[in-house]
Structures are given as structure tokens and as C-alpha cells.
Amino acid sequence: MSNVLVIAAHPDDEILGCGGTIVNHVRQGDTVHSVILAEGITSRDPKRDREERYDQLSQLAKDAEKANDVLGVHELILDQFPDNRMDQLDRLDIIKVIEQIIDRVKPDIVYTHHIGDVNIDHRRIHEAVITACRPIPGQHLVKQLLFFETVSSTEWMPPQSAPNFIPNWYVDISHSIEAKLKALQSYTSEMREWPHPRSIEGVQVLSEWRGSNIGVHHAEAFILGRNILINENEENQ
């Protein structure tokens, strides 16, 4: 059994990136924790005003709880970093929050955003997670680190601007795609109409394409950032 930690920027990113994989983990007896660091609404206004958007923020938090319940997530942690403004924060402040969560949850596996992404929050969180997951002697060791793609964001980053998302790790979600799509439907304010890529149809098309890459009906794709194999006999001595 593994302890799994998903670290995402905004409500729905955790499901867009690895919702089917989360379901697979839960079904095999793993414990999954989801962390959503930014509040996900106020960037739609010229100026951040959380009081003005209080009702929408409250509803989005409820949607996140419902969506993660659909997947069987053990714990959902909602922080309130400013939406699409995380470049205005000291990166160390983001790192410290993630380090505290890692120290408490002690995950074996961490999923987070790919660096080559048009969304600034996704990039800042990728950088912070990389730092927080350093394999430092005497601290908790994250054995596996994986980066996911986020539709309507990762694919919009031009290849000359940042590293392309070129996956080298695939997860068959043919038996969990329906749960992923159901969870996304909980996000009433986030999903769009087809042919927007962040639509139910767009997510399904991507899962079919990634599945066809490996000869299955549906898949999620990742980049393996780090994989540490530990001799469990020596670890327990």
C-alpha cells in the first residue's frame, strides 16, 4: 500500500491531470491526499477581491469536496493562494507550505504539474514541489515524482518557450475514465463546452489519444521526474 499526494494549483487540475490514476490508486488500497493551493476564482476580475467572490469561492470549495469524494480521495486540503498570481509570492513561502504537508502526509508518490505550461501558477508549483521533494538524508523520502499535463494549459505553451510535455509514463484508466468524467462534472463553474479542450468531450478525447499511444482505450500520461528504488529489507533494519 502506498501513500499518494497530488499537488495541484487550482480546483479541477487534480482531476484533469490524474483523476483516473487517483481512482486506480484507491481501488488498489492506496491512500490518496489531494492538495489544491490556489483559490481558483479571483483572476477573473481586474483586481483580487475575495469578499466580492465569496459565494463563488464557497461553491467552488464544495465542488472540490464533491469531486474528490467521487474519486475516493482520503483527504482534500484547500489552501487560498491568489489565483494566477503566484508569481507575486516568494517561492520559499510556497515551498514551506508544501514541505509541511509532505512532512505530515509522508507520501511515497507525488503527482504535480509539468513545468512547460502556460499557467504561471502551474509553473511555480512545479518548481516548489521539486524543491520540497529533494532527497535529503534524515528527511522523508518521496520515492516517485510524476508530472501531469493539464488540458487547456499545457498544450498551449509554445515548444520554443519551455520544455514540451513528452510523456514517458502511462497509466491505463480504461476502467476509471467514467469516474474521472463524473468527478469533473462536479466542477460546475470550471468545465466548458466542446470544442474547448477543458470540456467533458475534450478530456475524453485526450484520454483516448493517450490510450492509443499504448494500445488501450483510455490512459493518462506523465513525465517521470524521479524514481527511487529502496531495498525494503534494509529500510526496515
Question: In which residue ranges do the predicted regions lie?
Answer:
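Metal-dependent de-N-acetylase/amidase catalytic core
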Residues: 1-7, 24, 28, 55, ...
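ATP-dependent adenylation/pyrophosphate-handling site
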Residues: 3-11, 15-55
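Short, conserved clusters of charged catalytic residues that mark active-site
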Residues: 16-17, 59, 93
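Generic alpha-helical hydrophobic packing signal
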Residues: 32-35, 65, 204
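Short glycine-rich catalytic loops that host catalytic nucleophiles or stabilize transition states
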Residues: 37, 78-82
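Glycine-rich phosphate-binding loop and adjoining beta1-alpha1-beta2 segment
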Residues: 42-71, 75-76
